[in-house]
């Protein structure tokens, strides 16, 4: 009798190898390979055969376009991120840290869609019906078309889907489900991958729009195989500090629209609502203090004025820390200050914080970060009427940023008077713009 071929799978990313490896060549995880049992390998082969369909090549000019049906979720922020509304039969994956409000958001959306007359099935593997009902009472989300199911078995969920003509399915969360066809534990790579595949098949076959909540790892990525994000139609990340009110919903993948928009929500006593009057949520206009500078960043099509806070203090064992800002970018800016402005930061602790719990990734905030650091180092307060916009290069030049006019218009609306920018705006905004091409010019202005 021929010996069965062994198959090992990485529990971190789903990579498969014919022999055990100490380190995964795909994701780099150590000691993550486990051997799959014969039953698991058999199921994987059967599922792979089901998904294989023969088709003929067709000339691209003969392909007929599909017209997707969209409908509003009655939430302007979510509709914005989804590209104009929810597409019928789409599969949406939402990830986020514990306590950020994923379940609260989807329960609100479930209620909105149910009030439109659509039948919604909310499946929870983490909470009881009574717990969900308590939250629904608080959110005023009770409606006859919203059905609750506390179930962990995929086959039982699919059976319930076939009983009623559901239009919306919400799964909270994908890591808690298991399939009877697979012998591995719930939340394993194989379970997550194959359950998602089955949900995708059902969504497309019956035009059921499906939301899936996914846990995230300590690195901030959605737990489970990387192929999970490739299988779904839309990938959204829910960000925010659980101790603060503002939440950001970012799109990282969207087969039916763009990914350049960000939804902004506010956590209130009645749940998540579309945030209003965002202008003063991320900065204060109080007394000028050292270590504080204001900048303007773009979040999708929005311009937001943010306060950058910096603390520089002498230390025998200097360290650098950044909250809401990239640590590697901060290290580069500190090296630039030492090299170009001869500011001796080698014996100083440097802490940088972006107020409001917002994570800044664009380089247009470089100038504001540097201004806050210099202000703290020299103990020299900066005017609250001034904003700093610009990207810094490695040679100390201040480079232009995109959407400069949009940023300056937002600053004007917030009644700022001065702007330190790399170039003049295309139109007269009504601000005093001080053009700085090099970092040394900013120091002279300060």
UniProtKB/Swiss-Prot annotation:
Task of the protein: DNA-dependent ATPase involved in processing of recombination intermediates, plays a role in repairing DNA breaks. Stimulates the branch migration of RecA-mediated strand transfer reactions, allowing the 3' invading strand to extend heteroduplex DNA faster. Binds ssDNA in the presence of ADP but not other nucleotides, has ATPase activity that is stimulated by ssDNA and various branched DNA structures, but inhibited by SSB. Does not have RecA's homology-searching function.
Membrane spanning residue stretches: none
InterPro entries hit by this protein: AAA+_ATPase (IPR003593), DNA_repair_RadA (IPR004504), P-loop_NTPase (IPR027417), RecA_ATP-bd (IPR020588), Ribosomal_Su5_D2-typ_SF (IPR020568), Ribsml_uS5_D2-typ_fold_subgr (IPR014721), Rubredoxin_2 (IPR041166)
Any Gene Ontology biological process: recombinational repair
Binding site for ATP: 96-103
Motif placement: RadA KNRFG motif: 253-257
SUPFAM superfamilies: P-loop containing nucleoside triphosphate hydrolases, Ribosomal protein S5 domain 2-like
Lon-protease-like: annotated span: 349-446
The species this protein was found in: Campylobacter jejuni subsp. jejuni serotype O:2 (strain ATCC 700819 / NCTC 11168)
Gene3D superfamilies: 3.30.230.10, P-loop containing nucleotide triphosphate hydrolases
Record Pfam families: AAA_25 (PF13481), ChlI (PF13541), Zn_ribbon_LapB (PF18073)
Entry EC number(s): 3.6.4.-
Recorded domain comment: Has a putative N-terminal zinc-finger, a middle region with homology to RecA with ATPase motifs including the RadA KNRFG motif, while the C-terminus is homologous to Lon protease.
Family indicated by similarity: Belongs to the RecA family. RadA subfamily.
Protein name: DNA repair protein RadA
GO (cellular component) term, any one: cytosol
Zinc finger map (C4-type): 10-27
Keywords, in A-Z order: ATP-binding, DNA damage, DNA repair, DNA-binding, Hydrolase, Metal-binding, Nucleotide-binding, Stress response, Zinc, Zinc-finger
Enzyme class of the recorded protein, top EC level: hydrolase
SMART domains: AAA
GO molecular function, one term: ATP-dependent DNA damage sensor activity
């Amino acid at each position: 009798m021929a010996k069965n071929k062994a198959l090992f799978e990485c529990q971190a990313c789903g990579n498969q190898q014919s022999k055990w490896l100490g380190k995964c060549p795909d994701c780099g995880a150590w000691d993550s390979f486990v051997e799959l049992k014969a039953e698991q390998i058999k199921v994987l082969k059967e599922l792979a055969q089901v998904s294989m369909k023969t088709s003929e090549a067709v000339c691209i000019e003969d392909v007929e376009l599909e017209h997707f049906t969209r409908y509003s979720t009655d939430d302007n922020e979510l509709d914005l991120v989804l590209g104009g509304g929810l597409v019928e039969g789409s599969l949406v994956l939402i990830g986020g840290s514990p306590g950020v409000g994923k379940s609260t958001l989807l329960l609100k959306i479930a209620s909105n869609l149910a009030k439109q007359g659509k039948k919604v099935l909310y499946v929870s593997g983490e909470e009881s019906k009574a717990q969900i009902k308590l939250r629904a009472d608080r959110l005023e989300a009770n409606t006859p078309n919203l059905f609750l199911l506390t179930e962990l078995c995929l086959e039982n969920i699919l059976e319930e889907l076939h009983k009623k003509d559901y239009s919306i399915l919400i799964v909270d969360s994908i890591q808690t489900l298991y399939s009877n066809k697979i012998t591995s534990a719930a939340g394993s790579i194989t379970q997550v991958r194959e359950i998602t595949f089955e949900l995708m098949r059902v969504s497309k076959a019956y035009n059921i729009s499906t939301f899936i909540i996914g846990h995230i790892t300590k690195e901030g990525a959605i737990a489970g195989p990387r192929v999970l994000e490739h299988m779904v139609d839309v990938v959204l990340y829910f960000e925010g500090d659980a101790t603060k009110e503002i939440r950001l919903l970012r799109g990282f993948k969207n087969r039916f629209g763009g990914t350049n928009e960000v939804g902004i929500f506010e956590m209130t006593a009645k749940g998540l609502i579309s945030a209003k009057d965002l202008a003063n949520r991320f900065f204060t206009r109080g007394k000028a203090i050292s270590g504080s500078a204001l900048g303007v960043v773009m979040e999708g099509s929005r311009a937001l004025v943010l306060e950058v806070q910096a603390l520089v203090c002498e230390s025998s064992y200097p360290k650098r820390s950044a909250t809401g800002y990239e640590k590697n970018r901060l290290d580069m800016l500190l090296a630039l200050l030492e090299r170009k402005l001869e500011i001796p930061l080698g014996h100083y602790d440097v802490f940088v914080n972006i107020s409001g719990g917002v994570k800044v990734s664009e380089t247009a905030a470089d100038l504001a970060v540097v201004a806050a650091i210099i202000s703290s180092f020299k103990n020299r307060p900066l005017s609250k009427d001034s904003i700093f916009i610009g990207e810094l290069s490695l040679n100390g030049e201040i480079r232009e940023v995109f959407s400069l006019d949009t940023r300056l218009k937002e600053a004007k609306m917030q009644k700022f008077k001065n702007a330190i920018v790399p170039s003049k705006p295309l139109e007269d905004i009504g601000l005093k713009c001080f053009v700085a091409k090099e970092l040394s010019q900013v120091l002279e202005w300060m």
